[in-house]
């Protein structure tokens, strides 16, 4: 048996063009969370320095990302 695990990432999109536009700022790092089929907020070190955060919907992502941006901006070293 081969112990290597094949990991493939897939960019998460939407069939709804309007939703796609709203989703882009949050999910440009979506390939990181492809296996979870979730929407990504950001790359580590951008708005979420400790991790990539994923949410189940673009609406939740937008809300959480907005709060995170403000929190991280206030605490910037």
Swiss-Prot record:
Name of protein: Pollen allergen Amb p 5a
Signal peptide boundaries: 1-22
Keyword Metal-binding: no
Cystine connections: 26-61, 33-48, 40-54, 41-65
Source species of the chain: Ambrosia psilostachya
Key words of the record: Allergen, Disulfide bond, Signal
Chain coiled-coil ranges: none
